[in-house]
């Protein structure tokens, strides 16, 4: 399971996390981040890769719960049309929302993977709740100062952790 800021696995994008890949790790339920993992930030529709990935999980019988720090309106607008369960205002990296997602999945914690694009929310949340973590590259790099700063720190921490 993830430890601190170190993910268990890395993937170039959500499309690389196939049902077969998950099954090979013993995973049978997924907690997925929304913004910059399944969709562009603030988008109401998934990216092409996000839509294909959700369809492949559904077809493989692997349940997915989307967990986001966004508002109910934002997360519901994305998830309801896709028929995907969700937890809004999750409080990542703290455990409240992750625990709710685990309950919704109805799968033992050790058989769940959390997939997301950020060290300081997704990886820490998985680590805190002792859940397997797969870190993906973000769909797009945000351009605001805060996000550029945060991504620079994440890259530095990631390099340091790999050494």
Language-model features: locations:
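Asp-based, Mg2+/Mn2+-dependent phosphohydrolase catalytic module
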Residues: 2-32, 38-44, 48-163
